[in-house]
Amino acid sequence: MIDKKILRKQQIKLLSKNKSTTADEGIKLLDKLVETAEWKQSKSIATTISNLFEVPTKPIIEKALSDGKMVYLPKTMPHRQMAFLPFTNYEDLVVSDYGIPEPKYNEKLVNQEPDLVLVPGLAFAKDSNYRVGFGGGYYDRFLAKYSGKTIALVPSAMHFETADWEIGEYDIRIQKLIFV
């Protein structure tokens, strides 16, 4: 069993060394994503603004918008909660305390039930669909109340055959993992 804190550090180090590979694989993952029934049936998707070592989300956002879908981004809230707000353009985003671009909060625009949520993470287990996220618990808290579809795009550096880490009672399975 690998301690999640150690695994997170190892994964960030590995992913930071493999940014170009992950970016290249992101193109293939997007191609696979748009062929899924979940994507085709969704009128709204939620994703994040990726950091430099994650699968790039800008092409995903652009594809969703060109397909006529509403795009929602997470806004971190107190008590490790998230609210999903509409993406308008990159200039309207503000940098959070975590250094992540987020939409400005507007209670009237919150959508906690987008049709499809693309779930980020650092490690994904193929045999069980569990993930290791960034450690804040934001997505697990959100997903515990969410009833829509979930997908994670998994580049090779995040792909684990089995969960070599402890699965906690609050860890939530991702419905579908898409591998390179």
Regions found by a protein language model. Name each.
Residues 11, 71, 118, 135, ...:
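Residue-level signal for inorganic ion chemistry
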Residues 45, 117-118:
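Receiver (REC) domain switch-region micro-motif
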Residues 61-62, 132-138:
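Charged helix-capping and loop-helix junction motifs
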Residues 69-70, 128-130:
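Short active-site oxyanion
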Residues 75, 86, 102, 121, ...:
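Short, structured patches in soluble enzyme cores that scaffold and shape functional sites
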